[in-house]
A protein has these predicted regions:
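Extended terminal accessory/targeting regions
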Residues: 16-204
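Sec-dependent signal peptide recognition
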Residues: 2-7
Length: 204
């Protein structure tokens, strides 16, 4: 099997401006307003051309001090981001989206935190990686409205994982909707709470 490796140099990389999330309005991290990555991650693309196996851990500390880890051995494929969005926003492992996508995939697979917190992490990690405010907010909207969500956290009873109930967003994705939302974000510069309200609005 031909192995293709990529190295992400993420040694204690700090990132720029942040609005505290709704569940922690007092959170302020002026030194690392978008959080920071630490360590390095090495990954191997598998022969199927879709899956990537992490050969070392990726750590991200979000602006509220919560540490998110993608462990070595994790297999990711970008599935936490609906595939239909790839044509609008680019592939999940393209350019500046890559680190945030890896963490988001692992968080969605583990389901040990609320999906809203995972999506907020994804937004902050994108900004930490240098994704523009408009692109990051548009992707956040798309995930919040069309993402694969769950009602209950996955717990562990002894060595047996308790299965969670998945609640898919059965809403069709249209390029027109995404482009209209992107234009609104560019012109109005909404907060994440305003974006969430728009995403929760009934389909016309």
């Amino acid at each position: 099997m031909r192995k293709i490796y990529f190295l992400l140099a993420l040694a204690f990389t700090a990132c720029g401006g942040h609005q505290p999330p709704a569940w922690d309005v007092a959170a302020v991290r002026p030194k690392h307003p978008w959080g920071y990555y630490s360590g390095q991650v090495e990954a191997r693309w598998e022969n199927d051309g879709r899956h990537t196996t992490l050969l070392s851990e990726l750590h991200y500390t979000d602006p509220d001090g919560v540490v998110w880890t993608a462990p070595a051995g994790s297999v990711v494929d970008g599935a936490s981001i609906p595939r239909v969005l790839w044509s609008f926003m680019g592939g999940p492992f393209d350019g500046k989206y890559r680190n945030a996508s890896v963490l988001h995939d692992v968080a969605y697979d583990e389901k040990t935190r609320p999906w809203r917190q995972c999506d907020r992490m994804f937004y902050n990690a994108m900004r930490c990686s240098g994704v523009s405010p408009t692109e990051a907010k548009t992707m956040y909207y798309a995930l919040y409205r069309h993402g694969r969500h769950w009602k209950h956290l996955r717990g562990v009873a002894g060595a047996i994982a308790v299965e969670e109930e998945t609640v898919p967003r059965a809403l069709p994705v249209s390029e027109e909707e995404i482009q209209e939302t992107r234009s609104w974000i560019e012109n109005a510069n909404p907060s994440l709470s305003q974006i969430e309200a728009r995403a929760d609005a009934p389909t016309q």
